[in-house]
Amino acid sequence: HKSFSGGMYDSRQPMPDFVHTVAQQIGLTNTGYVFYKMDTLDIMPTHVDHFETYERVFGVERNNTYRALIFMEDWKPGHYFEVAGVGKTNWKAGEYALWHADVPHAASNIGSSSRYTLQITGELVDGKSI
């Protein structure tokens, strides 16, 4: 097995234009993007992201840093996501989760097909709350 956490395609690479539209619809600004592929048996145990590079590059303080995870395809058996101790399954393509930088989260894939998501890191636009 090549990896325990999955494969990433991040903002250092060309991004499709739609990622900016998605970020605006969610209410995020000063955004960084990562497409994430989680193969069968990839796991990401419960953790809190550090966001040091994002916060340095964009000049954003941690208390203003948020992460959105957009599900690129409908849920498939064996795909799992958890944020703040609450598990999520049965999602539809386009649904998303949004959480503050200090919130623990986890993911795993024990299914027979890859799981694809888009991670967007950013600040909430003025007046937006979760």
Model-derived features with residue positions:
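Short His-Asn-centered micro-motif
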Residues: 46-49, 72-73, 84, 99-102, ...
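Histidine-centered active-site/metal-ligand motif
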Residues: 47, 52, 61, 104-106
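A short hydrophobic beta-strand segment most commonly corresponding to one strand
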Residues: 66-71, 96-98, 112-129
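Short conserved catalytic/interaction loops centered on acidic-Pro-aromatic/His motifs
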Residues: 79-83, 108-113
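Conserved metal-binding segment of the jelly-roll/cupin
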Residues: 89-105
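Extracellular structured ligand-interaction cores
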Residues: 30-33, 41-43, 65-69, 76, ...
